[in-house]
Amino acid sequence: MDIFSEILPLREQIKTWKREGKRIAFVPTMGNLHEGHLTLIRTAREHADIVVASIFVNPMQFNNVDDLTNYPRTMDEDVEKLTSENVDLVFTPTPEIMYPEGLEKQTTVDVPVISTILEGASRPGHFKGVSTVVNKLFNIVQPDVACFGEKDFQQLALIRQMVIDMALDVEIVGVPTVREMDGLAMSSRNNLLTLNERQRAPVLARTMRWISSQMRGGRNDYLSLIEDASDQLRAADLQPDEIFIRDARTLQEPTEETTQAVILMAAFLGQVRLIDNLVVELSATSSDEEE
């Protein structure tokens, strides 16, 4: 497995593969890899001859300096995991490589509307940081296909819109959320939870499934439903941050025409912000998501 931290040698290798007619898949990560990331890698392998991954903790997408400082960095372990998955190349740039003139002078990519609603409203600039770094990584790696987790539902929608708007020649593949045995969505931030917090963390997913069962049962008083869900979170000492019920296609308020909705949730458990989402088929009558 090749490991490059500089752009030029990576580009030379990419050019070689392109000349050989190889199809290239790309999985961008911020490291601290878990089974969810490895599922992205395996999915990428199904779509291409060559798999490239990146490990870069992107300072542009952090609103909180402490959050950036405390983000887990486990480069050696990450490289071992990627090696075991037979990744062909890993790109490990520093902030100085990605933003040589500093963040203030960096050209940015801003996807309107979708970057400022929902989570974007409470984290101004976050999605601009995401779209900028992903666009730059696409320009560097030149992938034919890129894989992203559906756990970050709004981020995936943002990237898909950016690819359309910028006419980027890359296929975007969404990969279903990977969960722990107790239902908690896998996340690098889970490592920051104390033992007690980790035991309470699955309440987020359970509450989300409860909302889903209520919706599929015909309940559509969404504001009241969100309040009830917030109470469930607080009862388990989780602090609700955001709970949205939106049309899964538009991310706008559901209408009578909405057949597929998405529940978007975020809550603080101690100092850790957990996120999750669940798509709900409003025409469905089964209750297989219930506890």
Curated annotation (Swiss-Prot):
Keywords: ATP-binding, Cytoplasm, Ligase, Nucleotide-binding, Pantothenate biosynthesis
A Gene Ontology cellular-component term: cytosol
Keyword Acetylation tagged: no
Chain positions recorded as beta-alanine binding sites: 61
Binding site for (R)-pantoate: 61, 155
Binding residues for ATP: 30-37, 149-152, 178, 186-189
Active-site residues, record numbering mapped to chain: 37
Task performed by this protein: Catalyzes the condensation of pantoate with beta-alanine in an ATP-dependent reaction via a pantoyl-adenylate intermediate.
Family matches, as PANTHER family: CYTIDYLATE KINASE/PANTOATE-BETA-ALANINE LIGASE (PTHR21299), PANTOATE--BETA-ALANINE LIGASE (PTHR21299:SF1)
Record's protein name: Pantothenate synthetase
Native organism: Aliivibrio fischeri (strain MJ11)
Lineage: Bacteria, Pseudomonadati, Pseudomonadota, Gammaproteobacteria, Vibrionales
